[in-house]
């Protein structure tokens, strides 16, 4: 493709002097490649946080967030105490794969430092919550013992790379997982600072550039990559900054269709921000995946907005400069024009629960984990049960993009043992849920997330129970409907592609959306703004009743809400706020 434009507007990107860019750009430059004064801040005994003006932001590049218990915030303020600080630690786990030995170490660290809780994320990794400052190094060094790190799990870098589950179901899945791992290793920052701060390694003087690809300013914002194998769009490939859709012939991987420009984040009352689904721009042979990654990430590095962070994601770079220009720039860096995209089809973006047998004769069990929270509760000992399984398991574990866990690669001879442990701990009944609940997803939100305006993980199960009653009354209990909730509009649970979605506005108040595509192919549209539970249930009740009466055979709920006129179809991200 030839670039026919006179030239791009470079007034907001990395070509400009530092003083013309946003404050985070200067912060990154002065951080000495993300070292800052984190070490000194960790030693400051006066506060439970990390002192130093830049360190809270810099620690995100290390996979660590400063948080506080918002349930206690007002009371501690009244007592003139600082917030009850703790830390979130997010792991880098390409493709969501962990060995049994790694699982046992995660369990040990969760019990020692993470409030006996493991949280599976919407990007196939784990988070520890409630880690105290004095336990940060012990936790990260414990992860290092089993070859896991937290590098680039947050920050203005390529985040954790996703891949369809289950890699071991076929040789195709294995190839795609291997590519996801290679992309992750290739695209991550070098980050010698991480090794010095968390592992105590000495700084080594060198004349070589410390970050030859990313440079001192890294990327304008986070950058998300995922690899998917049709027909299951479990990673929601259209929501990724860069997506690779695997194309196979005769069961063998030949290459990938490239998708660019997806992203969920937006801000209420800021119509210039919006979710966007990625565009399929062409096909590459499988051998070109690392070169394509460099070309796309490099384009965003050089042309992304570094003046206004709310406008810095790749989706806005594309809409600012135009898809034709961005594709032309990618092709210029590759040195060739992309081939036309190959045909593919998606049928859902959910998980298939229960037992499955791979072509190699090994078994896999997908276990429903409501909102990804692995803890022991009165009704089920999830943490204990999965630890018992990991202690004998001869295969691996896979975290799914829908926050569930696959006990994978089980030899046929070991299947009865794993099945017996599932029964012993009551895990064999976890999948016996409504299709609505099995297709539900929530972010963490309160009490730990500093951005949350309303409940999400703690509230969605209750709301789902009430909607289940409505659906059962109308004979819709066997209809698979996706429902997602977030505590703010940033979209961590990818709500804007769900058939029913709620994003928090204030305590007990949400925006209600309908019309997302069942396999993640279409954005939804706001139906009600800033409403409480009664209004939400009334709306669902009315539309579900109409759906039960007038739906076409095989018509999904999201499709019906558009056909029946409840919401308009959103054909492009810029239409989302219209």
UniProtKB/Swiss-Prot annotation:
Region Disordered: start-end pairs: 1-21
UniProt-recorded Gene Ontology molecular function terms: 4 iron, 4 sulfur cluster binding; heme binding; metal ion binding; NADP binding; sulfite reductase (ferredoxin) activity; sulfite reductase (NADPH) activity
Cofactor note: Binds 1 siroheme per subunit.
GO CC list: sulfite reductase complex (NADPH)
Catalytic reactions of this protein: hydrogen sulfide + 3 NADP(+) + 3 H2O = sulfite + 3 NADPH + 4 H(+)
Essential cofactor(s): siroheme; [4Fe-4S] cluster
A GO BP entry: hydrogen sulfide biosynthetic process
Alphabetized InterPro entries for the sequence: CysI, NiRdtase/SiRdtase_haem-b_fer, Nit/Sulf_reduc_fer-like_dom_sf, NO2/SO3_Rdtase_4Fe4S_dom, NO2/SO3_Rdtase_4Fe4S_prot, NO2/SO3_Rdtase_4Fe4S_sf, NO2/SO3_Rdtase_FeS/sirohaem_BS
Pathway(s) it belongs to: Sulfur metabolism; hydrogen sulfide biosynthesis; hydrogen sulfide from sulfite (NADPH route): step 1/1
Binding locations of [4Fe-4S] cluster: 443, 449, 488, 492
UniProt keywords, alphabetically: 4Fe-4S, Amino-acid biosynthesis, Cysteine biosynthesis, Heme, Iron, Iron-sulfur, Metal-binding, NADP, Oxidoreductase
Positions bound to siroheme: 492
Quaternary state and interactors: Alpha(8)-beta(8). The alpha component is a flavoprotein, the beta component is a hemoprotein.
Record's protein name: Sulfite reductase [NADPH] hemoprotein beta-component
Organism of provenance: Methylocella silvestris (strain DSM 15510 / CIP 108128 / LMG 27833 / NCIMB 13906 / BL2)
Lineage: Bacteria, Pseudomonadati, Pseudomonadota, Alphaproteobacteria, Hyphomicrobiales
Protein encoded by which gene: cysI
């Amino acid at each position: 493709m030839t670039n026919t434009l006179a030239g791009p507007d470079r007034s907001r990107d990395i070509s400009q002097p530092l003083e013309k860019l946003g404050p985070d750009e200067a912060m990154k430059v002065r951080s000495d490649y993300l070292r800052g004064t984190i070490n000194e801040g960790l030693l400051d005994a006066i506060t439970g946080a990390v002192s130093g003006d830049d360190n809270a932001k810099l620690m995100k590049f290390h996979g660590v967030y400063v948080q506080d218990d918002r349930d206690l915030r007002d009371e501690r303020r009244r007592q003139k105490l600082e917030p009850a600080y703790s830390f979130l630690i997010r792991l880098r786990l390409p493709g969501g794969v962990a060995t049994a030995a790694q699982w046992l170490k995660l369990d040990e660290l969760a019990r020692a430092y993470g409030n006996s809780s493991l949280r599976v994320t919407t990007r196939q990794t784990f988070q520890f919550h409630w880690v105290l400052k004095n336990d940060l190094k012990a936790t990260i060094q414990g992860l290092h013992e089993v070859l896991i790190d937290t590098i680039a799990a947050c920050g203005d870098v390529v985040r954790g790379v996703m891949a369809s589950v289950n890699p071991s179901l076929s040789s195709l899945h294995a190839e795609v997982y291997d590519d996801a791992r290679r992309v992750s290793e290739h695209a991550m920052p070098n980050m010698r600072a991480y090794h010095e701060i968390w592992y105590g390694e000495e700084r080594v003087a060198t004349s070589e550039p410390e970050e030859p690809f990313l440079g001192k300013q890294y990327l304008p914002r986070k950058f998300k990559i995922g690899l998917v194998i049709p027909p299951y769009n479990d990673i929601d490939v259209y929501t990724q900054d860069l997506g690779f859709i695997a194309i196979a012939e005769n069961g063998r991987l030949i290459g990938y269709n490239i998708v660019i420009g997806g992203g969920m984040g937006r801000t209420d009352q800021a119509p210039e921000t919006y979710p966007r689904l990625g565009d399929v721009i062409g096909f590459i042979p499988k051998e070109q995946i690392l070169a394509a990654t460099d070309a796309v990430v490099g384009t965003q590095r050089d042309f992304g907005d570094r003046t206004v962070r709310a406008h810095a994601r790749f989706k806005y770079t594309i809409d600012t400069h135009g898809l034709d220009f961005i594709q032309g720039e990618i092709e210029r860096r590759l040195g060739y024009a992309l081939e036309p995209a190959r045909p593919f089809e998606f049928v859902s973006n959910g998980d298939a629960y229960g037992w499955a047998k791979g072509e190699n004769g090994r078994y896999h069990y997908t276990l429903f984990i409501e909102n990804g929270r692995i803890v022991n509760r009165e009704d089920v000992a999830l943490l204990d049960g999965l630890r018992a399984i990991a202690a004998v398991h001869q295969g691996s574990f896979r975290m799914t993009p829908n926050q569930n866990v696959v006990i994978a690669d089980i030899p046929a001879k070991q299947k009865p043992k794993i099945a017996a442990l599932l029964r012993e701990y009551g895990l064999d009944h976890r999948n016996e849920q409504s299709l609505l609940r099995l297709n539900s997803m929530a972010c963490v939100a309160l009490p730990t997330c500093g951005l949350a305006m309303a409940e999400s993980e703690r509230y969605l199960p209750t709301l789902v129970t009430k909607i289940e009653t409505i659906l059962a009354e109308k004979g819709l209990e066997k209809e698979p409907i996706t429902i997602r909730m977030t505590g703010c509009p940033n979209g961590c649970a990818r709500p804007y592609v769900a058939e029913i979605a709620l994003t928090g506005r204030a305590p007990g108040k949400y925006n209600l959306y309908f019309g997302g595509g069942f396999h993640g192919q279409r954005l939804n549209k706001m139906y009600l703004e800033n409403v409480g539970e009664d209004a939400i249930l009334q709306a669902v009740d009315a539309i579900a009743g109409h759906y039960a009466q007038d739906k076409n055979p095989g018509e999904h709920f999201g499709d019906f809400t558009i056909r029946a006129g409840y919401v308009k179809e959103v054909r492009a991200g810029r239409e989302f706020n219209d």
